[in-house]
């Protein structure tokens, strides 16, 4: 439910951070 959604959003934020740092 909401906990899974929070974990997914956290994962997306981590990915976005990595992608942003790469550029």
From Swiss-Prot:
The keyword Lipid biosynthesis does not apply. This is Pseudin-3. Keywords: Amphibian defense peptide, Antibiotic, Antimicrobial, Fungicide, Immunity, Innate immunity, Secreted. The keyword Iron-sulfur does not apply. One of its GO terms (biological process) is killing of cells of another organism. Belongs to the frog skin active peptide (FSAP) family. Pseudin subfamily. Expressed by the skin glands. One of its GO terms (cellular component) is extracellular region. It is found in: Secreted. InterPro entries: Antimicrobial_19. It comes from the Eukaryota. It comes from Pseudis paradoxa (Paradoxical frog). Possesses antifungal activity against C.albicans and is also active against E.coli and S.aureus. Its main location: secreted.
